[in-house]
Amino acid sequence: MDKLIITGGARLDGEIRISGAKNAALPILAATLLADGPVTVGNLPHLHDITTMIELFGRMGIEPVIDEKLAVEIDPRTIKTLVAPYELVKTMRASILVLGPMVARFGEAEVALPGGCAIGSRPVDLHIRGLEAMGAKIEVEGGYIKAKAPEGGLRGAHFFFDTVSVTGTENIMMAAALAKGRSVLQNAAREPEVVDLANFINAMGGNVQGAGTDTITIDGVERLHSASYRVMPDRIETGTYLVAAAVTGGRVKVKDTDPTILEAVLEKLKEAGADLTTGEDWIELNMHGKRPKAVNLRTAPYPAFPTDMQAQFISLNAIAEGTGAVIETIFENRFMHVYEMHRMGAHIQVEGNTAIVTGVPALKGAPVMATDLRASASLVLSALVAEGDTLIDRIYHIDRGYECIEEKLQMLGAKIRRVPG
């Protein structure tokens, strides 16, 4: 297993390009199955989960064509099997996203139940109930969800989500795109990635209205046609590099991004004392060498502060002036990185879903271990400001969500290198 070695103390300075958003790319790739012709998806991040999704298509008999710009062409007409096998699904929970499109387009699907994700329980019952509301017959047996559309195909339905679910909203929205009649999804997720998926469905000739609000209306169409689409930028990667600049007292400009999808995070960075300037597709943060001020925050569904930025702000608070409380309302078990940060000298108390962080003047380099994707990013940020060397183990977690993290940080002046395990 690869490791990262980071020597702290360098003030970050420079410009980097932000990659496409994994959490938009995965549902958009799944939605290509709805089309009746070839579809091209561009700005895909070069990440393991994306490769797994493309491999899953290969298993189904679809041969994706990848060009030199990392755009992928998928022709779902060549599909031979409607099964998403366990050995692929277990490595990537987002494989559940092929369930809705396959049932809608081909009338049946067999998708392995995803295994446990490191962050608490993420049930798939909303996906199942949503499809049942549209007339699908579903059995769960032998660790597989087996779904069949009724005679004549799925029917539009009104469906209320008991809890806000991003992948649940996406799965049912994709299924509804080809269902007969109108579907109304209430208490739907409002995330920008949901909006990106709706825009993609509409680019193929679909009729999705209201994405970005909590009520999405989908009028099913007979067919969806070929299209070419570019995935939105990654707001979490954007936020992570801005926090990296803030903790090191540096100046970083992130390009090919969108400031409007990150407002809650930018607000907190201003509160921490950062100077921010934005353009249509760029954000520049300058700390002028100052130490950040601690901030209080509470995670909640979009447009509030994103849970995927919580760990990074714990790193910021760990070296900030003052004390900040971080309240996690989305996932359980989301403070696993705190115990690794203790090894670096951080002062953090966890009480239930709250972490109280008292800033210290400096952290100390230490061997630490990544436990999940965003937690691992917080360890990288802490290592950038720690005295001496930090060795981060199990960085495959980082590689799941950050494209070329060491190259991008090196471009900003960080002392970081990857060593093979």
From Swiss-Prot:
Molecular function, one GO term: UDP-N-acetylglucosamine 1-carboxyvinyltransferase activity
Main location: cytoplasm
Enzyme's top EC category: transferase
Modified residues (2-(S-cysteinyl)pyruvic acid O-phosphothioketal): 117
Binding site for phosphoenolpyruvate: 22-23
Pathway: Cell wall biogenesis; peptidoglycan biosynthesis
EC number: 2.5.1.7
CDD domains: UdpNAET (cd01555)
Keyword set, alphabetical order: Cell cycle, Cell division, Cell shape, Cell wall biogenesis/degradation, Cytoplasm, Peptidoglycan synthesis, Pyruvate, Transferase
Reaction(s) catalysed (UniProt annotation): phosphoenolpyruvate + UDP-N-acetyl-alpha-D-glucosamine = UDP-N-acetyl-3-O-(1-carboxyvinyl)-alpha-D-glucosamine + phosphate
Residues annotated for UDP-N-acetyl-alpha-D-glucosamine binding in this entry: 93, 122-126, 308, 330
One GO biological process term: UDP-N-acetylgalactosamine biosynthetic process
HAMAP family: MurA (MF_00111)
Protein name, entry field: UDP-N-acetylglucosamine 1-carboxyvinyltransferase
Organism of this sequence: Pseudomonas putida (strain W619)
